Regions:
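Generic detection of intrinsically disordered/low-complexity segments and helix-coil linkers/edges
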Residues: 1, 63-67, 185
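Hydrophobic, proline/glycine-rich low-complexity stretches
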Residues: 1-5, 23
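Short, low-complexity intrinsically disordered segments
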Residues: 4-5, 69, 111, 189
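C-terminal catalytic domain of Rieske-type non-heme iron oxygenases
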Residues: 123-314
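Acidic, low-complexity intrinsically disordered regions
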Residues: 2-3, 67, 109, 262
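Rieske [2Fe-2S] iron-sulfur-binding domain
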Residues: 11-125
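Glycine/proline-rich, flexible active-site/cofactor-binding loop segments
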Residues: 8
């Protein structure tokens, strides 16, 4: 049985053949780079010789060279190919190597296979993200544990992100539902204007849809109009970092949907090619603590049901 998952660890454009990129994905320290042929590579970010981070090294035609003693590692296999102080008649022992990970590119993200099993029969996540027009992307490490980040994305996404000229409400439009391995929640939203009505709103011209994966994958967030036509789509990769923090990288775009009722600021931002959303790099602890636990209960229940042993599930 396959127990591993594909995890989006970085944006494709962040990984090159000049400087290795250090990331922490699902708690594992990795180094990403491209070899001399442009092939994407992922190794454990630790030299087996003196445990120095390989991300401090240099990409060479032969692989990734450790910055401490110059050991060089093949990016595809992790095998050590060069040790500078060996004589010409000496060979590098085959047991010397760094752990290599299966890695792939898809829909603008670098995905790394973490865990047991083979990824051959596991499709890469994010196939439902099909950008059109200009994209807006970024990365951050935020001050919240990964499990809490996913829960807040369901209970109160306004603590984590915002859409320009939009105010999210706590009015849920229907019950949470499972779709393609994600728990999906719809909530009402309104345009923010100087003539903003009272806090109690009965008409919601906008919908914010958040879809959180049960395991691995990417978070999908959409801003929709009342007829569920998409206005903005985001794909957010999240995973556990160190000391209770969360690694994020994201991509998003604005659709060509006409929005007659949008305020002038929305149209001006579009004309000036400004990002229609913002991912908060710092989380407001007071706002997070005030969130009521609601749809995230269903996320915990769905995970328990999905990953329960066969005997228990029966």
């Amino acid at each position: 049985m396959t127990t591993g998952n594909w995890w989006a660890a970085a944006l494709c454009e962040s990984v090159n053949g000049e400087k290795p990129l250090a990331v922490v994905c699902n708690g594992e320290a990795l180094v990403l780079f491209r070899n001399a042929t442009g092939e994407l590579c992922a190794l454990e970010d630790r030299c087996p010789h003196r445990r120095v981070p390989l991300a401090l090294g240099t990409v060479t035609p032969k692989g990734l060279q450790c910055g401490y003693h110059g050991w060089t590692f093949n990016g595809s296999t992790g095998m050590c190919t060069t040790i500078p102080n060996l004589r010409e008649d000496e060979r590098v022992p085959s047991r010397y190597g760094a752990r290599a990970y299966r890695v792939a590119e898809s829909h603008g993200f670098v995905h790394v296979w973490l865990g047991e099993g083979s990824p051959d029969d596991s499709p890469l996540p994010g196939a439902d993200y099909q950008p059109r027009g200009s994209e807006f992307s970024g990365a951050a490490v935020v001050n919240i544990a990964h499990g809490e980040y996913l829960a807040a994305m369901l209970d109160g996404p306004e603590c984590l992100l915002e859409f320009g000229s939009v105010r999210m409400t706590d009015f849920f439009l229907g019950d949470p539902r499972l779709e393609a391995g994600r728990l999906v929640v719809d909530r009402g939203a309104v345009w923010t204007t100087r003539m903003l009505p009272p806090a109690f709103v009965i008409d919601h011209p906008l919908i914010v849809r958040t879809a959180v994966p049960l395991e691995g994958g990417t978070i999908r967030v959409e801003l929709l109009d009342a007829d569920e036509a998409p206005l903005v789509t985001l794909s957010i990769a999240s995973s556990a970092n160190r000391r209770g923090t969360t690694s994020l990288c994201w991509r998003g775009f604005r659709h060509d949907t006409r929005v007659p009722g949008a305020p002038l600021r929305w149209h001006l931002a579009r004309a000036r090619a400004r990002a229609p959303f913002r991912i908060h790099p710092m989380i407001d602890g007071a706002a997070l603590a005030a969130l009521l636990v609601a749809p995230s209960r269903d996320l915990a229940a769905a995970r328990a049901a999905r990953f329960a042993p066969v005997s228990e599930a029966a």
